[in-house]
C-alpha cells in the first residue's frame, strides 16, 4: 500500500505537519519513535514562550496536547523507530523494525539534539549549572 504521507518525528514540527496534512484530507502516518516520542520538549519543564499559554505550560503537557489534536484530525501515530530511508525515485521507502512504509511524500522532522561541548565536568554538572534548553 502506498501511503499519502509519512512523517518521521513527533516533536512540534511533526505534529503540526500531521495536523495540517490530516485537515487537507490526507492520511498522515507519524513515526514517533519507540523511546523518544514527543521530541526534546518531553524533557523540558516550564515552557513560557509558546503562544496561547499565557501562564506557561509543561513541555510534556504541550506535546500530549499536540498529539491529541493530531489524532483528533486523523493522524495515525505509530511508536516505531526508523532504521532506513530510501528517498530515491517517485515512491519513497521508510523502514522500521516493524516493516516498510511506501509513500510519495516523507517529512523528516527529527528535531534537535543537544550539542555538548565535551569539557571537563560537563556531564557531572548537567542539571547543576550546565543545562540544555529546547525552547531557548
Could you tell me what each predicted segment is?
Residues 3-73:
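Beta1-alpha1 glycine-rich phosphate/pyrophosphate-binding loop at the start
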Residues 1-8, 24, 29, 36, ...:
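FAD-binding core/adjacent interface of flavoenzyme oxidoreductases
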Amino acid at each position: 500500500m502506498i501511503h499519502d504521507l509519512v512523517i518521521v518525528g513527533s516533536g512540534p514540527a511533526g505534529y503540526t505537519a500531521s495536523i495540517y496534512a490530516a485537515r487537507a484530507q490526507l492520511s498522515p502516518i507519524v513515526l514517533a519513535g519507540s523511546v523518544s516520542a514527543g521530541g526534546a520538549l518531553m524533557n523540558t519543564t516550564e515552557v513560557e514562550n509558546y503562544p496561547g499559554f499565557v501562564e506557561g505550560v509543561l513541555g510534556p503537557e504541550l506535546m500530549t496536547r499536540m498529539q491529541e489534536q493530531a489524532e483528533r484530525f486523523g493522524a495515525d501515530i505509530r511508536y516505531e523507530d526508523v532504521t532506513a530511508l530510501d528517498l530515491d525515485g517517485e515512491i519513497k521507502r521508510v523502514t522500521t523494525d516493524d516493516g516498510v512504509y511506501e509513500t510519495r511524500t516523507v517529512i523528516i522532522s527529527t528535531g534537535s539534539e543537544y550539542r555538548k561541548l565535551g569539557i571537563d565536568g560537563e556531564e557531572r554538572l548537567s542539571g547543576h549549572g550546565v543545562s540544555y534548553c529546547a525552547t531557548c
